[in-house]
């Protein structure tokens, strides 16, 4: 993403919005920019499924359609994590984390008809909690960084 913006600078926390560096992510302008993007029609189509296959394994399926050349990315995330900080500026604090990426997949390439179907069995590490997990996926134009569609599927233990 940094290279697509003709930059060599990576910093934390760095937020990219639709393939562009967005330094004002802590301001109201970020919410407005996200809202504007969300009002636009998607230029790709993505579906996700997430289901248990046994007590410590999840079945993940992603289907997507977009123009040829577009890349699909899928991430398995976990919410409601905590860490006790032992050193540095936050020493002694208990930090809370959501949307922590546990597994990252991609780029998955569309075929010449602009389709991709991808399936995987994910064995959960002992410290992961399936009920706190979910999937996100996005289709991205690799030449411009533009996000053509993005979706999130939280775990539903229904």
Feature-to-residue mapping (PLM):
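Short, conserved sequence motifs used for protein processing/export or organelle targeting and
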Residues: 1-158
């Amino acid at each position: 993403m940094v290279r697509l913006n003709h930059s060599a600078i990576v910093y934390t926390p760095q937020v990219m919005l639709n393939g562009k560096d967005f330094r004002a992510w802590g301001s109201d302008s970020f919410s407005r920019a996200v809202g504007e993007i969300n009002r636009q029609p998607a230029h790709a189509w993505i579906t996700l499924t997430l289901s248990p296959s046994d007590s410590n394994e999840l079945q993940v399926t992603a289907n997507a359609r977009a123009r040829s050349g577009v890349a699909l990315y899928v991430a398995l995330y976990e919410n409601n994590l905590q860490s006790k900080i032992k050193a540095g500026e936050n020493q002694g604090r208990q930090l809370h984390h959501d949307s922590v990426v546990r597994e990252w997949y991609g780029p998955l390439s569309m075929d010449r008809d602009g389709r991709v179907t991808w399936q995987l069995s994910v064995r959960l590490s002992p410290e992961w909690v399936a009920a706190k997990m979910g999937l996100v996926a996005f289709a991205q134009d690799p030449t411009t960084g533009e996000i053509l569609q993005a979706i999130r599927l939280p775990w539903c233990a229904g």
